Amino acid sequence: MPSMANHRKHRGYKTQRVVADWLKQWYPYAESTGAGRQGEDITGIPFSIEVKARSDFQPLAWIKQAESNKGGKIAFVVSRCNGQGENAEEYLAFMRLGDLMKILQERAPNNEPTRCKQCGGWMIENSICHTCHQGGISLA
């Protein structure tokens, strides 16, 4: 009968493979490095991930581990909690707030509001006014 330690290692390695396989939708070279190896848990991606499948919760230690391997990449942790199956989309992910804001500002920058040229309502520049549905952009 396999030991509990072997079961945990197998679960950790399986979780790394599940996450790597899920990431292949966007990063076709994503590969799990295998449980227990030093360095990044998944290679072939533009960020550093530490994958955890554990019952204890040590977020600060885990993020420090991810950061120690990051080599200039943004680091984060993917955590498979007890009771979660093998759907990586459902796993938790966390990172430092400063790193998250860098990503969010690229995707959704804080644009200053301006007045719509048609109705005078507030809107974000170069977008459609939510009041008159026209405004700051050319609809032609």
Where are these regions (language model features)?
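Catalytic phosphate/metal-binding cores of nucleic-acid and nucleotide-processing enzymes, i.e., regions
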Residues: M1-A140
